[in-house]
Every structure is written in C-alpha cells, then in structure tokens.
Amino acid sequence: MVMEMIAAADVREDDEDYQSPLDELFERLELRNPESLAVKQYKIYKQAAGKTAKSILISVGVRLAAFNLESIAGLTATDELELEQVGERKTAIFCVIPDNDSTFNFIVGMLYTQLFQMLYYSADIVHDGELPVPVHFLMDEFANVALPDEFDKLLSTMRSRQIFVSIILQNLAQIKALYKDSWESIVGNNDTLYYLGGNEQSTHKFMSEYLGKETLDTNTFGKSSGRSGSYSTNYQQAGRELLTADEVRLLDNDYALLFIRGERPIFDKKYDILKHPPYP
C-alpha cells in the first residue's frame, strides 16, 4: 500500500499547479478529517520546491525499495500476527533470520519496535501498569537485528511491566560495537549473566574482573642455625583473581560461569538439553 502511494506521487518541476493522484487522495482525506495528522504532515512536504520534493520522493523510494519485492509486499500487506494479543494470552512468535544474509533483518527490527510499543501501551493504559501474561523475548542474533531506539532505556523499565529479555551474544565485542557509550548499562540492567565460553580477548578480561578476587593467606617460616639461631613466622594476605583472563579462556567446554545479582559467582556444569524429559 505504501509503495502504491509513492508510485502515485508525482512532481513536475515546471508545473507547480499539477496535482498527482496522491495529492487528490490527501485532498479527499482533508475534506473528511481536516485535523488528520497525515494531512498536516503532507502539507509540510508540499511546501518543498519541485526539485526538493522530487529528491524526497526518490530518497523514500530507495529506502523502501525492499517492499517492492512480491514476497516482502505479501508478508507485510495484512496483519496476521495479532500482536495485540501478546501479553493478553499465551503466545509464541518465532522470527527466523538467515545467519549469512542480513538484507531483511530490518523486518524483525520493525517487529521488535512495534511490539514493544504495543506492550508498553497495553501495560500502562489498558492494564494499569502490568501485563496479565508475562512476555519473554529470547533475542538470539541480538547483534544482527536493528533494535528500537534507546533500547538500553527500555531494558531498565520493562520488568515492572512484566516484559523480560534474554540477550544472546557471541562475545562482548558485538554489543560494544552496537552501543559504544551504553553497553555497560545494558549489561548492568540484566540481573543474570551466563557465560558459556568463547575466544574473544576483551570478554575474557571482563569476565575475570566480573568474578572479582579471592584472598590468599600466606604463612612464611624462617629458621637460622648457629650459636644465635632464630625462628620467625610471617603472616600475609594477598589478593588474586578468582580466574585470570587466561584461565577464563581455557574454561572447560563442559562448564559455564553464572552471575546472579546479589549472589556470589557460580562455576557449574552446563545442562545437557538432550537429557531434558520433553526433548523428542
């Protein structure tokens, strides 16, 4: 529909009085609803000179070119997901994207943005602050999807509305590339951090620092012999990382590190999903 409207728009630089089919469409809309936001925004666009208006149309057409594809147009033509039911009843939505081509990953990003907006509206306006059915986002391929603006702020406010997120990354370098100034805030807004292992240096260093230090008690004994022999004992305390960055790198593949807010770090064996009872 949007691409049809863009196709109906036409600008003639030598004839400012020319009316395109899209101009006529907005005129009819203004007759029905003079206060329409769409009409007000379109009037702002129409203030542009012919050359500028044509440039705007070309830019919009290029940015939305993917929607000219029949498959994408068919996918987005009608609403079949019933997003308004998420948070109202038990629902599962699977968004599968290829790991070797990010061309259409923006569609999942659009879904995230729209869904977060609807969930916040439902929680705040319809249900007085909290969704009746908790919603959990499992964000695999987190670094490869366009996320809503100010996602770090959403992350700090969503839990009170019964909206939860699990962010899955290959390493910390991915989130640092996406959120150069706020990646620490995103990590800090997660109450649980589960490290399965990896081979990226800055991640090893971060995990080592996150684990903290242990205190080592050292007793040193000294003895000298001879006519004036003596005996001495020296007691010292020293700090050491629970795991150095190199030890984190060499972490056994069967083990993982678990950090839960307010608890000491946990070094435990990974769960074998194949042993889970419902596993087919």
What residues fall within each predicted segment?
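Conserved ATP-driven motor cores of ASCE-family P-loop NTPases powering translocation/secretion/packaging/pilus
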Residues: 155-257
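P-loop NTPase motor domains
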Residues: 1-163, 178, 238, 246-270, ...
